[in-house]
Amino acid sequence: MSTLHKVKAYFGMAPMEDYDDEYYDDRGPSRGYSRPRFEDDYGRYEGRDFEDPRRDPRAGMRADLRGEPADYPPPGGYRGGYPDEARFQPREFDRADMARPRFGSWLRNPTRGSLAMDPRRMAMMFEEGHPLSKITTLRPKDYSEARTIGERFRDGTPVIMDLVSMDNADAKRLVDFAAGLAFALRGSFDKVATKVFLLSPADVDVTPEERRRIAETGFYAYQ
């Protein structure tokens, strides 16, 4: 466009369709749907990328070539019904070697293994001539029976003190008395069970094993 035409167009002396400039787009809008000037390619996709691999038998082959796991079932469709056999079979625990022992067996054999003691040795501990053969068990009800304990121990008799039936205050006083008595007469004072103590004279040597056996085999039988 010449300079004259530009001047005419500027003052309205020339038709607008004759005005041509690189900054002006004289093309009118096209009829119908027009594609946006700035398109976003993120929304574009091809249908074959979203095909169900279960319907396409070639999808598993493509997954193997790409190194991707194909965790979908093979083609063939859904198989109804249940399998003939259960997948997990119940285990049987009714074997003879796993039978539970009877209650009486635990009472007859309270100790097993290395702690078990020969019954013959246990009988020898209380036979005539053994220091523990004259052992006695006292079950005081209150602190007033401390005199009886002291007299038995002074005569050289091992004494088992069962303080289970006493209250804690009197039991503590009697324990202090027995400990002082054993110290004065050069004896020994040992605990064999809960609130049960053994007073041994100086000439009676009671080993830890014997004390444990006294507690396990029933010191209540020795009065």
Curated annotation (Swiss-Prot):
Biased composition (Basic and acidic residues): 36-69
Subcellular localization: Cytoplasm
Region (Disordered): 19-81
GO biological process, one term: division septum assembly
Domain of life: Bacteria
Entry keywords, A to Z: Cell cycle, Cell division, Cytoplasm, Septation
InterPro entries: Cell_div_SepF (IPR023052), Cell_div_SepF/SepF-rel (IPR007561), SepF-like_sf (IPR038594)
Chief subcellular location: cytoplasm
GO CC terms, sorted: cytoplasm
Function, in words: Cell division protein that is part of the divisome complex and is recruited early to the Z-ring. Probably stimulates Z-ring formation, perhaps through the cross-linking of FtsZ protofilaments. Its function overlaps with FtsA.
Assigned protein family: Belongs to the SepF family.
Subunit structure, as described in the record: Homodimer. Interacts with FtsZ.
Protein name: Cell division protein SepF
Lineage of source species: Bacteria, Bacillati, Actinomycetota, Actinomycetes, Mycobacteriales
Gene: sepF
